[in-house]
């Protein structure tokens, strides 16, 4: 059976991106590989063990996301507290929304963007979103 271990995104400012993911979501640096032309930094979520691989191609500062990329997602125990914390850090989360079907609440969430404009969904833990 396969195990999901990481997803990779390209970043324009490695230190800024690392700071964002560490500050916003508590990810920790688990591994780093530095080469002449690029660096790879793996940031781990200690709860799940999954990682985001930040790829910094030295000299490249901007990327396009194309039409295929949607978002990554994190769950939190207290969505309102996380929203207020990120707002206090001046990270500009979008307003909290509710997703319902036939009047039943399926999810509470908000979106935030990292320094390179990648969208991140933050969901209240519950139901399908564990």
Positions of predicted regions on the chain:
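Short, charged/polar surface micro-motifs in flexible loops or helix N-caps
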Residues: 46-50, 59, 79-81
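Short amphipathic alpha-helices within nucleic acid-binding modules
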Residues: 20, 79-85
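N-terminal beta-strand motif that seeds the catalytic metal site of vicinal oxygen chelate
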Residues: 1-18, 69-74, 123-130
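Core segments of cupin and vicinal oxygen chelate
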Residues: 2, 8-51
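Exposed loop/turn and edge beta-strand positions of beta-sandwich/beta-sheet ligand-binding modules
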Residues: 37, 68, 106
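Vicinal oxygen chelate
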Residues: 31, 74, 83-130
């Amino acid at each position: 059976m396969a195990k999901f271990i990481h997803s990779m995104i390209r970043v324009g400012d490695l230190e800024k991106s690392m700071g964002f993911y560490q500050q916003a979501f508590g990810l920790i640096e688990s591994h780093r590989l530095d080469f002449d032309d690029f660096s790879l930094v793996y940031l781990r979520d200690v709860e799940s063990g999954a990682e985001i691989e930040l790829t910094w191609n030295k000299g490249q500062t901007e990327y396009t996301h194309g039409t295929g990329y949607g978002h990554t997602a994190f769950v939190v125990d207290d969505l309102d507290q996380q929203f207020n914390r990120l707002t206090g850090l001046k990270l500009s989360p979008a307003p909290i929304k509710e997703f319902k079907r036939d009047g039943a609440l399926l999810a509470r969430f908000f979106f935030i963007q990292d320094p390179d404009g990648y969208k991140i969904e933050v969901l209240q833990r519950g139901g399908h979103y564990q």
